[in-house]
Amino acid sequence: MMNSRISIIIALSCIMITSIRAYDPDALQDLCVADKSHGTKLNGFPCKETLNITESDFFFAGISKPAVINSTMGSAVTGANVEKIPGLNTLSVSLARIDYAPGGLNPPHTHPRATEVVYVLEGELEVGFITTANKLFTKTIKIGEVFVFPRGLVHFQKNNGKSPASVLSAFNSQLPGTASVAATLFAAEPALPEDVLTKTFQVGSKMVDKIKERLATKK
């Protein structure tokens, strides 16, 4: 009986350790401002020397106003993550502002390292996500309303209105990562084997080439 209990405790401990390591590491000190000039590579960033830390390491003004939208998708994402705010290192949080032109789309994508919560600053958006069972959850959200996109699931936002729209996004990761579905498949470098794409989408090579060509211009 004792051996069984010990085995269960060990198994639960392993599960807890695995769960903890699946998210950003917890901070073990007051500050660990990212030192991006350091050559060391690790899961995160090494800490800047305390004497070199300034208030600027915790400040970013880049999401205070709408971004200039010049993409063919009609949207612009301005991240406020550890790459812009070094003081976010080890804190497991970040923000982003997304601005949409009328009819603008933030195309289907995933965040492999974070759940996302969006808060509507301006306009009205159609938003949604798809589960691994191919179930679509979609809703129209307006100013002051919130919608959640679970971690790792494909999701999108679209401005169906005739005026601009904006949201503020919050993430439970200092660097959530973004993988666009279309770009991941059709604009990978090196390119995904063509027969993989033709068989997956049940289309011919000419169609694959046409999609690649169009995506290449959508920067």
UniProtKB/Swiss-Prot annotation:
<keyword id="KW-0464">Manganese</keyword>
<dbReference type="GO" id="GO:2000280">
    <property type="term" value="P:regulation of root development"/>
</dbReference>
<feature type="signal peptide">
    <location>
        <begin position="1"/>
        <end position="22"/>
    </location>
</feature>
<dbReference type="InterPro" id="IPR006045">
    <property type="entry name" value="Cupin_1"/>
</dbReference>
<protein>
    <recommendedName>
        <fullName>Germin-like protein subfamily 2 member 2</fullName>
    </recommendedName>
</protein>
<comment type="function">
    <text>May play a role in plant defense. Probably has no oxalate oxidase activity even if the active site is conserved.</text>
</comment>
<dbReference type="GO" id="GO:0048046">
    <property type="term" value="C:apoplast"/>
</dbReference>
<feature type="disulfide bond">
    <location>
        <begin position="32"/>
        <end position="47"/>
    </location>
</feature>
<keyword id="KW-0479">Metal-binding</keyword>
<dbReference type="InterPro" id="IPR014710">
    <property type="entry name" value="RmlC-like_jellyroll"/>
</dbReference>
<keyword id="KW-0732">Signal</keyword>
<feature type="binding site">
    <location>
        <position position="111"/>
    </location>
    <ligand>
        <name>Mn(2+)</name>
    </ligand>
</feature>
<feature type="binding site">
    <location>
        <position position="155"/>
    </location>
    <ligand>
        <name>Mn(2+)</name>
    </ligand>
</feature>
<comment type="similarity">
    <text>Belongs to the germin family.</text>
</comment>
<dbReference type="InterPro" id="IPR019780">
    <property type="entry name" value="Germin_Mn-BS"/>
</dbReference>
<keyword id="KW-0325">Glycoprotein</keyword>
<feature type="binding site">
    <location>
        <position position="116"/>
    </location>
    <ligand>
        <name>Mn(2+)</name>
    </ligand>
</feature>
<feature type="glycosylation site" description="N-linked (GlcNAc...) asparagine">
    <location>
        <position position="52"/>
    </location>
</feature>
<dbReference type="Pfam" id="PF00190">
    <property type="entry name" value="Cupin_1"/>
</dbReference>
<dbReference type="InterPro" id="IPR011051">
    <property type="entry name" value="RmlC_Cupin_sf"/>
</dbReference>
<dbReference type="GO" id="GO:0030145">
    <property type="term" value="F:manganese ion binding"/>
</dbReference>
<feature type="domain" description="Cupin type-1">
    <location>
        <begin position="59"/>
        <end position="209"/>
    </location>
</feature>
<comment type="subunit">
    <text>Oligomer (believed to be a pentamer but probably hexamer).</text>
</comment>
<feature type="binding site">
    <location>
        <position position="109"/>
    </location>
    <ligand>
        <name>Mn(2+)</name>
    </ligand>
</feature>
<keyword id="KW-0052">Apoplast</keyword>
<keyword id="KW-1015">Disulfide bond</keyword>
<keyword id="KW-0964">Secreted</keyword>
<dbReference type="GO" id="GO:0010497">
    <property type="term" value="P:plasmodesmata-mediated intercellular transport"/>
</dbReference>
<dbReference type="InterPro" id="IPR001929">
    <property type="entry name" value="Germin"/>
</dbReference>
<feature type="glycosylation site" description="N-linked (GlcNAc...) asparagine">
    <location>
        <position position="70"/>
    </location>
</feature>
<dbReference type="GO" id="GO:0009506">
    <property type="term" value="C:plasmodesma"/>
</dbReference>
